[in-house]
């Protein structure tokens, strides 16, 4: 999954293949912004897979590149690519054990890792990370090869954004990015105006429940999606991080729009999510 983000980490456009990736990648980009701040440099690339930082499960590694123009220090855009690696360690090959109870059971946890420094892959350091921990990756050469492909994607994306700006100007490009997001927001608001309130409940195989109440406000053209009553965090791997809940909600509302709009940050603006603390979602 590849995507372009604005300077705040807001999703602008993407290749619409895996919605749960695309709806959660903004949280990963924003984690890098929070952790790195003013130290972000053009030519650097970062990676992470931490579920509490916008990740999904550990085999999905997100590679992120800031796009910084000459003479400037702050990123104007970000590009990112999330890919599923065949194995990142864990107690079973493939890093998806059915009986995992702790995050380290699923493999190597990566958060805010510098992958490329000013165009140079930090391969020894990256190998050391994948080979560390109680359950290291089983084929680090393959991980490195996959990461090189992801790096190529984000670097090419950054180059294309710079070419776009050189041709049309920064002001015009950023204005159209905002327009794309604003248009998506307006389309979702039109959907909300037609929604009726409802309550739904889904039982899980483990005896837990996911509960959701949809509470539209037609006058404000906003909607509250309230997950109050959902079961508490389980002592197994049936839990989902917050970013995944946001991504699933975003995708549902995108499917209610008939027009051909990209999935982006604008789709989320009219939505208010209420998610209980320490719940399974």
Map each language-model feature to its residues.
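Conserved mixed alpha/beta core segments that line enzyme active sites in large multi-domain catalysts
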Residues: 10-12, 25-68, 201-205
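Hydrophobic core positions in small helical hairpin nucleic-acid-binding modules
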Residues: 20-23, 54, 236-237, 241, ...
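Mobile "lid/hinge" segments at catalytic clefts and subdomain interfaces of large enzymes
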Residues: 70, 74-161
């Amino acid at each position: 999954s590849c995507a372009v983000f604005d300077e705040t980490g807001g999703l602008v456009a993407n290749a619409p293949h895996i919605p749960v990736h695309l709806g959660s990648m903004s949280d990963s980009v924003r984690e890098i912004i929070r952790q790195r701040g003013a130290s972000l440099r053009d030519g650097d690339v970062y990676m992470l897979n931490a579920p509490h930082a916008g990740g999904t499960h550990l085999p999905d590694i997100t590679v992120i590149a800031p796009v910084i123009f000459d003479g400037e220090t702050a990123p104007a855009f970000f590009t990112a690519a999330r890919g599923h690696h065949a194995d990142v360690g864990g107690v079973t090959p493939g890093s998806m054990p059915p009986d995992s109870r702790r995050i380290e059971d699923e493999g190597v946890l990566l958060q805010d890792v510098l992958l490329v420094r000013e165009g140079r892959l930090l391969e020894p350091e990256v190998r050391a990370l994948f080979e560390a921990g109680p359950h290291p990756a089983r084929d680090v050469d393959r991980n490195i090869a996959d990461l090189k492909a992801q790096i190529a994607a984000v670097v090419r994306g950054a180059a294309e954004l710079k070419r776009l700006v050189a041709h049309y100007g920064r002001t015009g490009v950023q204005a159209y990015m905002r327009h794309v997001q604003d248009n998506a927001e307006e389309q979702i608001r039109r959907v909300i105006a037609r929604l009726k309130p409802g309550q739904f409940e889904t039982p899980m195989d483990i005896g837990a429940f996911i509960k959701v109440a949809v509470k539209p406000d037609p006058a404000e053209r906003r909607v509250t999606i309230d997950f109050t009553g959902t079961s508490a965090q389980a002592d197994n791997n049936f839990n989902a991080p917050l970013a995944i809940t946001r991504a699933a909600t975003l995708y549902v509302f995108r499917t209610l729009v008939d027009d051909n709009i990209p999935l982006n940050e604008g789709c989320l603006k009219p939505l208010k999510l209420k998610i209980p603390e320490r719940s399974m979602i």
